[in-house]
């Protein structure tokens, strides 16, 4: 912060606040100043941290079945008006059906988002308001996509984003969503460990796969399908025959290669403050990779006294 802790606390007192929370970013450097500035004054300091949280117990594939790679996979991509699953809407869905290790069918539709597409998103995706004006609404487009994806495992690059949108919109329009998912981004991290960045365009280039019209769902889905087929061949060479073999052969994801999430954690009492110090010390001493990475498993162990 550009504001000194002393001035911050004095201003909080001036405004009549009874408590103020201090959340340093990954560190506790402001804690001593906060303690000294609040000593003898009618205000409580709540000590906390904005942590770089990583899931160090993450399987590559969640809840894998025992079937081989000849089963149905629907590799898909979406374009949206923004990043919020609740505040933004889908503008395009593109998908490729894989079965018996081959491309069997394709699906593509624009979606009327019932809102203006921000200018910067139009520049990125080349999808304009005019292009979606007469497109089917989400209720119609999503039903067609879910029919296309029936009895299939969904595959996407950075799958949490795409499946998060699909699941939320299914809930919104009253459609069932019970699909398992595979993330080609996580697969890339174990199958192509020499790469430092795993964007779809970089991955396609590294594998000599054509990706024209990047950030259009139909094109990204096609490229992701080709990447996934290539990954299947690579995994088979490593002895992976069934979906459930992936976690057995490759183990857990290296959490230092995951993008951390920001989590705000507060100490509720003295025990919580001690646990907070232990978590922060561990992140700096044992798991520093570009940032002090706080492990989710350790947070669970030190959960008492924290909110």
Regions found by a protein language model. Name each.
Residues 1-80, 86-89, 96-103, 107, ...:
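Phosphodiester-processing cores and adjacent nucleic acid-binding clamps
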Residues 138:
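Conserved catalytic alpha/beta cores of large enzymes that bind or transform nucleotide phosphates
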């Amino acid at each position: 912060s550009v504001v000194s802790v002393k001035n911050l606390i004095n201003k909080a007192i001036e405004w009549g606040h009874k408590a103020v929370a201090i959340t340093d970013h990954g560190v506790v450097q402001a804690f001593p100043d906060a303690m000294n500035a609040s000593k003898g004054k009618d205000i409580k300091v709540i000590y906390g941290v904005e942590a770089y949280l990583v899931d160090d117990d993450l399987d590559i594939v969640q809840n894998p079945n025992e079937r081989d790679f000849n089963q149905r996979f629907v590799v898909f991509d979406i374009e949206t008006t923004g990043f919020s699953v609740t505040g933004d809407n889908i503008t395009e869905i593109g998908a490729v059906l894989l079965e018996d290790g081959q491309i069997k069918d394709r699906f593509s539709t624009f979606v009327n988002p019932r809102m203006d597409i921000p200018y910067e998103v139009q520049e990125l995706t080349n999808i304009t308001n005019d292009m979606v004006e007469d497109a089917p609404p989400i209720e119609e487009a999503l039903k067609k996509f879910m029919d296309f994806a029936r009895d299939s495992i969904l595959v996407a690059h950075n799958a949490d984003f795409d499946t998060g949108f699909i699941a939320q919109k299914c809930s919104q329009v009253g459609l069932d969503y019970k699909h398992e998912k595979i993330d080609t981004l996580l697969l890339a991290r174990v199958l192509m460990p020499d790469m430092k960045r795993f964007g779809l365009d970089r991955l396609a280039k590294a594998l000599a796969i054509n990706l024209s019209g990047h950030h259009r769902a139909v094109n990204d889905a096609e490229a992701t399908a080709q990447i996934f087929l290539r990954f299947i061949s690579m995994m088979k060479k490593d002895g992976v025959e069934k979906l459930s073999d992936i976690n057995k052969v490759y183990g857990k994801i290296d959490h230092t290669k995951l993008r951390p999430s920001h989590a705000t954690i507060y100490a509720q009492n003295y025990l919580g403050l001690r646990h907070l110090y232990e978590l922060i010390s561990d992140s700096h001493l044992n798991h520093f990779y570009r940032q002090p990475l706080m492990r989710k498993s350790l947070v669970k162990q030190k959960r008492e006294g924290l909110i």
